[in-house]
Regions:
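A mature extracytoplasmic/lumenal domain signature
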Residues: 88-90, 137-139, 152, 254-256, ...
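Active-site nucleophilic cysteine motif
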Residues: 198-202, 228-243
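A short, structured loop/turn motif at beta-sheet edges
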Residues: 77, 125-131, 193, 244-246, ...
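Hydrophobic/aromatic-rich core segments of domains that either
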Residues: 234-332
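Terminal peptide-recognition signature
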Residues: 84, 202, 278
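Intrinsically disordered, low-complexity N-terminal segments that are enriched in acidic
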Residues: 3-145
């Protein structure tokens, strides 16, 4: 349909699904009942393929993101010369930061490995001190999907020595030296040499062996593998270990997903959990995204490729390849964690829909 009178056709998509809701039944002894109802949603699909680029952008949203730490220490501890670092949203192919401002204490901005970081400094942090440490950002976020084929990367050059030293090593308790993980890595990739086919084989092999489940803490890949049930962070750990053992450079990406309710504009939305996925590197091309567990929806497959080399508009990329948040002080006790000092608050507000076409 030419909905805007521009002469260009607009593609409309119909989405049909079941929606859970609370039904009020006045005839029941317990009138409030959880049930489902059919819903159909029709909406235009906008997309843009930059010239000579192997990816497409689709519908996006302008979103206000706020992350704040409320100082509320659990212990009576005084800290001197405190430096509190919180990563800021990244500028990527599908994500553009329009504006950033502090919440509470002002910050200075630093660049760490190409990523923006808010740095908060306090001369002293007292046991009874109240306050907020954080930032608020206005960000454009779009859907992204690469349409590469294995044949297009068949002649990819080898990884540089710097990339091998940084992205093929066990730098985060990945248990890469254990028999169970090294054996899984060998079985996952087989004799495949093409980086795209190899990464997809590894992903599908992990999906065959693991099921999704939230755990009280993130275990190392060998523990999660033996258990057979893993959270998104544990999926990422296993995928990182198996990919790196097979010579594929990869790194963790996250940190949150905006609640996928674009009809709820100008309302503060709170994510249920944080979330992580990964990126893998194709020499000569760059970093490609891959979800951790979201495509693991069918027992023993076949698995969709929605998020293999693709992300939806609600994925929020913050501090790519670096730690999201760190704190140091002159006299910080070794056992003291961020959670002992503050409670974090995360909010998203969807402001308006965006068309990726320039």
């Amino acid at each position: 349909l030419d909905s805007k009178g521009t002469g260009e056709p607009t593609c409309y998509v119909s989405y049909a699904y079941e929606e859970p809701y609370i039904r009020d039944d006045p005839n029941a002894s317990d009138p409030f009942q959880l049930t489902f109802r059919d819903r159909t949603f029709i909406h235009p699909l906008y997309f843009h393929q930059p010239q000579d680029q192997p990816y497409t952008l689709s519908n996006g949203y302008l979103i206000e993101i706020s992350y704040a730490e409320e100082l509320l220490p659990l212990e009576s501890v005084s800290l001197d010369n405190v430096e509190w670092r919180i990563a800021l949203p990244s500028d990527t192919l599908r994500q553009k930061v329009r504006h950033v401002e502090p919440i509470g204490i002002p910050f200075t901005e630093e660049i760490q490995d190409g990523q923006r970081v808010a740095v908060f400094k306090l001369d002293k942090l007292q046991p009874d001190q109240a306050g907020l440490i954080g930032w608020k950002a206005t960000v454009e976020m779009y859907g992204l999907k690469y349409f590469l084929t294995p044949a297009e990367v068949e002649d990819a050059p080898p990884l540089s020595p710097d990339f091998q030293a940084k992205y093929l090593v066990d730098d985060d308790e990945l248990a890469m030296e254990t028999d169970i993980i090294s054996g899984a890595a060998a079985e996952a990739a087989g004799r495949e040499t093409n980086v795209l086919r190899k990464m997809l084989r590894i992903r599908n092999y992990v999906y065959d062996q693991l099921s999704y489940g939230i755990q009280p803490k993130i275990d190392t890949p060998d523990v999660a593998w033996e258990r057979g049930v893993a959270s998104c962070g544990e999926y990422v750990g296993v995928l990182l270990a198996l990919a790196r053992l097979n010579g594929i450079a990869c790194r963790t990406i996250g940190r949150y997903k905006c609640p996928a309710t674009p009809e709820q504009k100008n309302l503060p939305l709170e994510p249920d959990f944080n979330h992580v996925w990964l990126e893998f590197f194709v020499p000569g091309l760059g970093w490609l995204p891959m979800e951790s567990n979201v495509d693991d929806v069918i027992d023993q497959g076949p698995y969709p490729k929605r998020f293999f080399m693709g992300l939806s508009w609600y994925h929020t990329e913050i501090g790519k390849g670096i730690s999201f948040e760190k704190m140091k002080a002159d006299n910080k006790p070794e056992h003291l964690s961020l959670g002992d000092l503050a409670i974090n608050h995360v909010r998203f507000t969807i402001l308006e829909e965006l068309n990726p076409t320039p």
